[in-house]
Structures are given as structure tokens and as C-alpha cells.
């Protein structure tokens, strides 16, 4: 590209960023993405890396969608737990009336401090969300789920009565109100969404999300989460293999993906990710079924190494920081590392 065109392009890019905000346009190959964005870990090291900035951005709208039992709520609860570790306040708008406090506690959520609302209709849910955001005192608000945000008119109407586009209009209006307040108060709002099938689609993907198109436009990050397999110990099923694709990302280059394990009753297995990424970045040596770290054998087979890292928290933390340094992410100094019971 000649010099004049380069100058014109640079001026246009600067004008776009000035008018629409940092991250509204970028080169796909850029690695030096916005470093001043405040983020919260997703609870998955691989997903934090794939997001490019080390986690989910604050002051933005996030959409997490996928099929049933794919790990949508687990991922949001992990994000809540990470926010609480940093001293933040979290709210859960349970429109599905399906939150399991015991499971949330097992994942690491401080349920005593978690704000929860079970609204009667979609308008009430979104009004509560807006009031919490405007207060400036809540750091993350989760809405579970968009599909359950039933408009008041539909609840009060007759069963079977056609209600065309009510939910889409409700979402569009609410997001217009929410966006400016979210940015001003630096609150993260996570919408969980479900998948539906479009009728009559022959070519292309028939899947779509509920609630119209507004959320697709307003979301800074959209995550597509899927269950890809099962984790077994002998004959017993102990968890799911999960893949998250970053469908949209306005704070870093999109279209990356992360694979991790979700263990029943535990949530995302950070130890499994440390093993996989440690081997990938040559921090952990793998010879046959044996794994070694700093020349010392730490276990035979992934399950045994996972147990070793659970017992030796400081070693797991040390490897994690080395992985973060290798990929250019900030160290998680705020993460509390309990004293290791196995040392």
C-alpha cells in the first residue's frame, strides 16, 4: 500500500476508534490488543488465553449460548466466583428459576454474598438488571436466560394466542437503555441464551439464538459453548469435555477456541488445563504416560497428575504463571493460593 493510502487508512481507523470506542476496528493479526481493558477470569485458563485479554471484559455485554447441558450456567458461575475472589459483588437474575445454590457453592461461589432475583416476567427481570447496573455497586450481573424472559403481555394473554416479536422488541428496548449505563459504571452483564432451529434452512447453519438480533449487535463477546465428549473413570462418568468458540470479540481478534473439562460437582478443571497447556508450552515433560516438572516425575496418567496438582496448589500456581507469561498475559497476583497440604 502506498504512503498516501496508508495515511488515509490510519486517519480513518483513528476516527472510527475515536467515534465508536477502542476495539471497534482492528487488524485480525494484531496481538497488541487493548491492554488497559479490565477483565475477570472465566475460570478457564485456556479460554482466558483465547479471549486475548485474559478474561471477560468489564463494562461490556457478554452472551454465552449453546445447547442444553453444555455448561453455560457452569461457565457463568465460574466467572461469578472469580469476580468474588477479587472482592466484587455479583447478582444472578434467575428467570429460569433453576439455580442450584449447592452446585454454585461447590464451584466456588460465595452464595451468602450472591444477590439473586427470580422475576415474574421479562420486563421485571430487565428492569432489575438496569437498576443494579445504574447503582454502580454491582460488578457482574448474570441473566439466566434470554429464552425465559417472557413478556408481560404473553403471560397475561391466553394460551396459544399469537405474540409475534414481543420478546425481540423487549430485548431491543432494554439493551438500548442498558448499554450506556453498563459502560459508565463498568459493570459486566452476562446473558445466557439458548439455541433454536430455523425452519426451512437447507444451506448454511439452521441454528439461531432466541430474543431477536439486538443482543448479537450489542454484545462485545459472544461465546458458543458445546459438549464434545464424556470423561470417564473406569465405567463411571465424571464429567464432560467442553469446547468454547469465540464467535464475536470486540476487544481482541475473534474466532479462537478453547477446550477444557467440566467435572461434575467441581466445575471447570483448572488442573487439566494446566497439564495440557504445560505440555504444549514445554513446561511439563511427557514421556509415555509419565509427566515430569523440573526434572521430577509428578504422576503417571492425567488423572494422577490432576490429583497431584490439586494437592500441591503452589506448584499448580507456579506452572499457571509460567503459562501466562509464555502467552503474554498478566499474572494473577490477586488469586489466593492456599498453603499446599502435600508439601
UniProtKB/Swiss-Prot annotation:
It holds the Pfam family RecA. It comes from the Bacteria. It is found in: Cytoplasm. One of its GO terms (biological process) is SOS response. One of its GO terms (cellular component) is cytosol. InterPro entries: AAA+_ATPase, DNA_recomb/repair_RecA, DNA_recomb/repair_RecA_CS, P-loop_NTPase, RecA-like_C, RecA-like_N, RecA_ATP-bd, RecA_C_sf. Disulfide bonds: none annotated. The keyword Iron does not apply. One of its GO terms (molecular function) is ATP-dependent DNA damage sensor activity. Keywords: ATP-binding, Cytoplasm, DNA damage, DNA recombination, DNA repair, DNA-binding, Nucleotide-binding, SOS response. CDD domains: RecA (cd00983). ATP binds at residues 66-73. HAMAP family: RecA. Belongs to the RecA family. Can catalyze the hydrolysis of ATP in the presence of single-stranded DNA, the ATP-dependent uptake of single-stranded DNA by duplex DNA, and the ATP-dependent hybridization of homologous single-stranded DNAs. It interacts with LexA causing its activation and leading to its autocatalytic cleavage. This is Protein RecA. The gene is recA.
Amino acid at each position: 500500500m502506498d504512503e498516501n493510502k496508508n495515511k488515509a487508512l490510519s486517519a480513518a481507523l483513528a476516527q472510527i476508534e475515536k467515534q465508536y470506542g477502542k476495539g471497534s476496528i482492528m487488524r485480525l493479526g494484531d496481538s497488541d490488543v487493548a491492554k488497559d481493558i479490565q477483565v475477570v477470569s472465566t475460570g478457564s485458563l485456556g479460554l482466558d488465553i483465547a479471549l486475548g485479554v485474559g478474561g471477560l471484559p468489564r463494562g461490556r455485554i457478554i452472551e454465552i449460548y449453546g445447547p442444553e447441558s453444555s455448561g453455560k450456567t457452569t461457565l457463568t458461575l465460574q466467572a461469578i466466583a472469580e469476580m468474588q475472589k477479587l472482592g466484587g459483588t455479583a447478582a444472578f437474575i434467575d428467570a429460569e428459576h433453576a439455580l442450584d445454590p449447592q452446585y454454585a457453592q461447590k464451584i466456588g461461589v460465595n452464595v451468602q454474598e450472591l444477590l439473586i432475583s427470580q422475576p415474574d416476567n421479562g420486563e421485571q427481570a430487565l428492569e432489575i438488571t438496569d437498576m443494579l447496573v445504574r447503582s454502580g455497586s454491582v460488578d457482574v450481573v448474570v441473566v439466566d436466560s434470554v429464552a425465559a424472559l417472557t413478556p408481560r403481555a404473553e403471560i397475561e394473554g391466553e394460551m396459544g394466542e399469537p405474540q409475534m416479536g414481543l420478546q425481540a422488541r423487549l430485548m431491543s428496548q432494554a439493551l438500548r437503555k442498558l448499554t450506556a449505563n453498563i459502560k459508565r459504571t463498568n459493570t459486566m452483564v452476562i446473558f445466557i441464551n439458548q439455541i433454536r432451529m430455523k425452519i426451512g434452512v437447507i444451506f448454511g447453519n439452521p441454528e439461531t439464538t432466541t430474543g431477536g438480533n439486538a443482543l448479537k449487535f450489542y454484545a462485545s463477546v459472544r461465546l458458543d459453548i458445546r459438549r464434545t465428549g464424556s470423561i470417564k473413570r473406569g465405567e463411571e462418568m465424571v464429567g464432560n469435555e467442553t469446547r468454547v468458540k469465540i464467535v464475536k470479540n470486540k476487544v481482541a481478534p475473534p474466532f479462537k477456541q478453547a477446550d477444557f473439562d467440566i467435572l461434575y460437582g467441581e466445575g471447570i478443571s483448572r488442573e487439566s488445563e494446566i497439564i495440557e497447556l504445560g505440555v504444549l508450552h514445554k513446561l511439563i515433560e511427557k514421556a509415555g504416560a509419565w509427566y515430569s516438572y523440573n526434572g521430577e516425575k509428578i504422576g503417571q496418567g492425567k488423572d494422577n497428575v490432576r490429583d497431584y496438582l490439586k494437592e500441591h496448589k503452589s506448584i499448580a500456581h507456579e506452572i499457571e504463571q509460567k503459562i501466562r507469561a509464555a502467552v503474554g498475559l498478566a499474572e494473577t497476583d490477586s488469586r489466593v493460593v492456599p498453603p499446599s497440604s502435600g508439601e
